[in-house]
Amino acid sequence: MKVVVTGIGIWSCLGTNINEVTQSLKTGKSGIGIDISRLDYGYHSPLTGIVERPQLKGLIDRRMRAGMSEQAEYAYMASREALAMAGLSSPDGIIFGNDTSAKAMVEAHEVMKTHCDSEFMGAGNIFQSMTSTVTMNLSNIFQVKGINLTVSSACASGSHAIGIAATLIRQGLQDVILCGGAQEVNMYAMSSFDALGVFSHQIEDPHKASCPFDRDRQGLVPSGGAAALVLESYAHATKRGATILAEVAGYGFSSNGGGKLSTPSCEGSLLVMQRALDDAHITADQIDYVNAHATGTPQGDLVEAQALNQLFCGHKAWISSTKSMTGHECWMAGASEAVYSIIMMQGGFIAPNINLKNPDEESAKMRIATSTLEVPVDIVLSNSFGFGGTNSALVLRR
């Protein structure tokens, strides 16, 4: 059964709606800046994606807002846009990727530390602090009666959410699923990442701090927000006369099968991409564009480039990492990059891999778009790899 996308929504450092984000992608605009308070808190790098906080007063009842985490707010705004584009008020089900809710947990700890009494804690804290904070809130707001599921799989969470949603629709278990990913941006959420020493320290010019595939890359820049997609069976979408934006043609998943939790695997990366292509019944030479996972870390980008070079065997699909503009949107990245890819397919362009000045030995073999290209984009491969060896790849078709 064919699964199609009929609505997309986005709230990110590139903009707070599809139109704004489209312009940012076309112009190669960076959404990265500096949060100086992170240095006071103890971070070694103050770089972050700058994401506007939504104003939900007047959109959602006060009591309902009390249980919404930061990332649930982002997800509501992205979902609202996606459902409006699809011409729907409510989906059958909801599946979102989210792997932390740090701010609510820290705030709860501070209340207990100060008052030594849980009665001082707000009633909404429990709903903000659970990993399922996004889906529990949105399922209530949108009156969902079908699947209600949170996918927790590190930086592949958003991509897996789309893949699982598409699988359920293919199996005839749901007609319409709202899916996506969300990521909190507050400083509490990313301190443990900073402790690993994986962040870029290029603070002189934040817009140049994220350098995927560049020989001189220093590390990633954390970011966040939310992305949402409305997935439907082709039969359901055509019956109601919906505009079809793209098809989720293939979904691949793999695990690295061992090793250090933070170490990428060429074998796992290659396997997940091949499984996505097999699921879509296509070969690598049919891919027009790859939205790479590349985050700007020395080892991660190298391993992905090696896997891509093995997969394509000389075929030159265009490749770029939109993380060069957004930073690493972590739990939402797989979903946001699916949205970015659909925007490119609809607009007939490929967004640039900005800040790539000196390719390394592996990336030099690839056909990387360093400036915006006005070309048809019919089939996209989008990669997402996460800590713990969880990998997801999506094939999207125009």
What are these regions (language model features)?
Residues 1-63, 235-247, 339-353, 397-398:
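ACP-dependent fatty acid/polyketide chain-elongation machinery
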Residues 2-6, 26-34, 204-280, 289:
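Condensing-enzyme catalytic core mediating Claisen C-C bond formation in acyl metabolism
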Residues 5, 20, 26-153, 182-190, ...:
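Conserved beta-ketoacyl condensing-enzyme motif
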Residues 7, 25, 79, 94, ...:
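Conserved small-residue
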Residues 62-67, 96, 116-128, 145-161, ...:
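Cysteine-centered functional microenvironments
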Residues 75-85, 131-134, 139-142, 148-182, ...:
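Active-site-proximal alpha-helical scaffold in enzymes
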Residues 116-122, 163, 167, 184-239, ...:
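Glycine-/small-residue-rich "gating" segment that lines the acyl/pantetheine channel
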Residues 173-218, 251-264, 292-301, 316-366:
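Acyl-CoA/ACP chain-elongation machinery
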